[in-house]
Amino acid sequence: MLPGLFIHLAEADNSWRVVHTDGRPHLPPDELEPLYNGDETAHWEGDTLVIDSISLDERTWINPNGWFHSDQAHVIERLRRPSMNYMEYQYTVEDPKVLTKPWTSAWDTYSLSKGDLIENFCTNNENIEQLKKLHELESSKK
């Protein structure tokens, strides 16, 4: 956390998010451009950080299972830290083109690591030997 900013570093895929917590609204609709993390704003409700995201692009997964969404997706995340060692997380998805009503997850509790972030990357050619086998298999079908 920095004054006016929440910076979320993720160990997976070396990704990060920068979310403004200074009370600014979302961009006007004519200025929105779909982005992987969307247009994000945040505010505090007591000890809970509430992140509001719209304008998510088609690459975004709502959860780790690959839940798809439309251009009307609206995600509200809630993060709180009941102690120095734990973080709690909950999210609500509103998407009138995909869901009949808003859906809210249960609260998840995460133990916060005391170690360093480990580099983790994802590429399409990480395992060259596996790619060679796939290529040979495809070639044998011709």
Label every model-predicted segment.
Residues 1-142:
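PEST-like low-complexity, intrinsically disordered acidic/proline/serine-rich tracts
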